[in-house]
């Protein structure tokens, strides 16, 4: 009987070890998990690291929140969704398979991927943090405005920085062209105190009402907000432009933004616009757009 009791104890220890390891990982912020529903119909996927936390909506692969040391890095309006499928400001959104407007419908701006539900393809954790890959698959003829077979993968990795990778693969039998971009809404204390680096030849202040595309000058660029002592350092690869949007007081009412919201963020993100020549992919070819962000003082 005594050997049986020892075996039972060994089995209990084996069950306790994984649970203990899971608790350690959770306490260190090394695990990712799915959480409750959003205000829409999307499921939220959460990434955690020692320094921060990210929440991603599976609808549109949109980052709803990025917190570093307890502070929100992205601005999100009180009403996160625009009606009728229109573009919704806030967080970090994707523009695919076109950047800008195509057609006259409200839902035509920045492509249809932002309204699609992505599939959770994989999730990984490490001592440095965690990452998740979300996928969207299109069959030939599925979308009238983009009737090609393609797959889109979004990989988000959170360590001491946040990296977003957008990978487009031509899975069909004919070539196609597309454009894309990341649209972040960086929270600021005052848009009047923001300086941008690496966008033009020299540093410059954000201008009230600015909505402009600047040719890519290199991988690195930054946004410094003197009003809250924060600097966002970023790099981008696979883009032709950097898009700067500082609506300030010029556009007080814009889709899901309330009065005053336009003065609380700056948009600064990489894009590959059709105006500079869309990305052309032959069958089997892929293209990646990588956007890496780090928060400092």
For the regions a language model picked out, list residue spans one by one.
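Short, Lys/Arg-enriched N-terminal segments with co-localized hydrophobic residues
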Residues: 1-11
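Bacterial N-terminal signal peptides that target proteins for export
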Residues: 10-20
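Bacterial N-terminal signal peptides
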Residues: 20-29
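Beta-strand-rich N-terminal accessory domains
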Residues: 33-91, 219-240, 248, 285-297
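Extended, loop-rich substrate-binding clefts of extracytoplasmic carbohydrate-active enzymes
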Residues: 37, 107-159
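Asparagine-centered strand-capping/turn motif at beta-strand->loop junctions
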Residues: 166-172
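Active-site/ligand-binding surface loops and adjacent short beta/alpha elements
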Residues: 173-247
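Intrinsically disordered, low-complexity Pro/Gly/Ser/Thr-rich segments with frequent PxxP/GP/PP motifs
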Residues: 276-288
